[in-house]
Amino acid sequence: MTAAIHIDRDAEATPADEAFELWVNAVFDHTPAPTPSEISPELSIRCVELDEMTDVNSRFRQKAGATNVLSFPVDPDLTEKTGLLGDILICAPVVTDEAEQQGKDVSHHWAHLTVHGTLHLLGFDHIEDDQAQQMEALEIAILNSLTIPNPYA
C-alpha cells in the first residue's frame, strides 16, 4: 500500500520528499491496512521552526516550548471512508539538536520521528507501559527494515 503524502516545509535542512515517502510507506509495510484496499491512505507532514512548534505545542497540549513531533489523527470513521489519516508536525531544529545530543545520524532521527508520528496517526500510543513497549518494538522493526539502528539503544 502506498500513501499519498503532502509535504510542506517552513524550515531549513529537511529531508527530501523521497525520504519521507520511504519512511511512511515502511510503516504501512509493517501494520494492518488503515483503509479499505481501494482507498489509499493520505497524510500531511509539515516541517517547522521553533516558533511554530512552540505555539502549536502550547495551544494543543498546554505544554511550554517546542517538541520534536506532534501528530493530529482524524476520526477513524473518516479515515475508513476517505483515506485521510491526519497531520504530522516535525520541528527541524529540535530534530537536529536531539540527534547531535544523542550522537545519532540526523537522517536516522528524522526517520524515527516520521515513523513515530505515522504510528500515532494509526492509533498507536505510548501512554501506558504496555502500549509504549508495543509501539517501540514496532518502531525498531520498521527502522531495522530501513537499515536504521535501534533508536532506543
PLM region descriptions:
Residues 1-110, 121-153:
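An acidic/histidine-cluster motif and surrounding catalytic segment
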